[in-house]
Amino acid sequence: MTAEDSTAAMSSDSAAGSSAKVPEGVAGAPNEAALLALMERTGYSMVQENGQRKYGGPPPGWEGPHPQRGCEVFVGKIPRDVYEDELVPVFEAVGRIYELRLMMDFDGKNRGYAFVMYCHKHEAKRAVRELNNYEIRPGRLLGVCCSVDNCRLFIGGIPKMKKREEILEEIAKVTEGVLDVIVYASAADKMKNRGFAFVEYESHRAAAMARRKLMPGRIQLWGHQIAVDWAEPEIDVDEDVMETVKILYVRNLMIETTEDTIKKSFGQFNPGCVERVKKIRDYAFVHFTSREDAVHAMNNLNGTELEGSCLEVTLAKPVDKEQYSRYQKAARGGGAAEAAQQPSYVYSCDPYTLAYYGYPYNALIGPNRDYFVKAGSIRGRGRGAAGNRAPGPRGSYLGGYSAGRGIYSRYHEGKGKQQEKGYELVPNLEIPTVNPVAIKPGTVAIPAIGAQYSMFPAAPAPKMIEDGKIHTVEHMISPIAVQPDPASAAAAAAAAAAAAAAVIPTVSTPPPFQGRPITPVYTVAPNVQRIPTAGIYGASYVPFAAPATATIATLQKNAAAAAAMYGGYAGYIPQAFPAAAIQVPIPDVYQTY
């Protein structure tokens, strides 16, 4: 080997050694030199794993436990070409960074958000206060807010006779890091639980690993499947605010316990200290005149029995006024939460089943739900569960309170009285059918549907024309204008008139509209023989596929043919069976609404 060869070999070995020192995720990065300079300046490590690049965690020379909960902030709206070399100087200006996690994409760019954990809680609060809307680039503002480090899981499907200790023991057998189990007693029978529990873990990572392990189909507890999901994290209220609270939250009360009994029990230490008591089912809020009286009552009555039930007493957590105002505004359909095209719950009521048809009740959505839905009613997981994802104060849905008695009349006076408008679903679209009728989705004004809240759910338009036709037929055929072919209208009208005269009695004056969708109910009516005449409705009849679509099919042309074709109802589709066979309307036909 010559001297030149040895020199080349040494230089290649040196290059290989230097490249080996570059951590994974930094090597080959667009700003590799800037990241290496940052690591050299601060002494922090940097590694990429699981789709995120971690800077620090812990910082050099760190001794002690992991930072407490509430030390992490979420950073959003990050330009995709901004990396740690620009973010770290900004965030370390307000406090010592314990760890920064930048979410990365496969192309080497960031995903637009990151998490910054500080060593102390007050530093995180300062970062939110000072760095929110910070201009990281000209015209590009960062969004900084507190990060929710959720360590709590919801577990459903628990046998109702199991006690807290039994549940804790069983969960600790299959998962690690369990700190506590919260079990609520049944309101009706305090000897039973409500069939679910909340499990608190020592860290978010431990909770995430437990959730993955307990997913349905992997592990059975007590011999059957369980339901697992994230629970709503506890509201983190500022300590200074909590120092002013003089309201107690009391739970696990008996249903028959009265407000007077609660007031007497909590006011025994200082007569007159209780201002008022508000009891809701099995929990209550007790308002005191001073914080000292509230703390004294809490310390003495927590864990004691009242009318045979063990009380749980804590200080009530107030709701952030700014957030509450935002939630209320969203619940009313204003502000950032724009009202989607969703059903109006003032739509016609079926007096026989007391159901609002036009939309299923198990999918109540839209800006009006704060009038009709309480917390937990959609998935029924109770206080603190993950059933209702929308943020809001505890005991409310979307930040709103239950309207209570008289809500229906107040609703009609307000949102129910709106100007009716037409809905043109697909402009300039005609759908050919097998009969001489062309169905064209028209601009139709539907009674009792307000201008803002439509009954038709918004859906993205298909890219292909043929897909659009199929999509329209299947999902958006509710308001239709049936336009018969003029060439076949006369023959169809004559045939329909003859068939109608033989089966359906002549009606001189059209009866009032029943206020319900008129559909071919002979296919579902019990003990009613189907009419054998196949052409009773003529060539222009368009059947409805779903009885939940509350719509009137009208003949836009030739009113005389309409009156003859539909047995004198002049535009309304009649019930397709003889009037003497069964009384109409049929109450049990519409139970599926």
UniProtKB/Swiss-Prot annotation:
GO terms for molecular function: enzyme binding; enzyme-substrate adaptor activity; mRNA 3'-UTR binding; mRNA binding; RNA binding. The modification Asymmetric dimethylarginine is found at R394, R405. Residues 1-20 have a biased composition (Low complexity). One of its GO terms (cellular component) is nucleus. InterPro entries: HnRNP_R/Q_splicing_fac, Nucleotide-bd_a/b_plait_sf, RBD_domain_sf, RBM47_RRM1, RBM47_RRM2, RBM47_RRM3, RRM_dom. GO terms for biological process: 3'-UTR-mediated mRNA stabilization; cytidine to uridine editing; hematopoietic progenitor cell differentiation; mRNA processing; positive regulation of interleukin-10 production; positive regulation of type I interferon-mediated signaling pathway; regulation of alternative mRNA splicing, via spliceosome; RNA splicing. It holds the Pfam family RRM_1. It is found in: Nucleus; Cytoplasm. Single-stranded RNA-binding protein that functions in a variety of RNA processes, including alternative splicing, RNA stabilization, and RNA editing. Functions as an enzyme-substrate adapter for the cytidine deaminase APOBEC1. With APOBEC1 forms an mRNA editing complex involved into cytidine to uridine editing of a variety of mRNA molecules. Through the binding of their 3'UTR, also stabilizes a variety of mRNAs and regulates the expression of genes such as the interferon alpha/beta receptor and interleukin-10. Also involved in the alternative splicing of several genes including TJP1. Belongs to the RRM RBM47 family. Homodimer. Interacts with A1CF. Interacts with APOBEC1; form an mRNA editing complex. Interacts with RBPMS. This is RNA-binding protein 47. It comes from Homo sapiens.
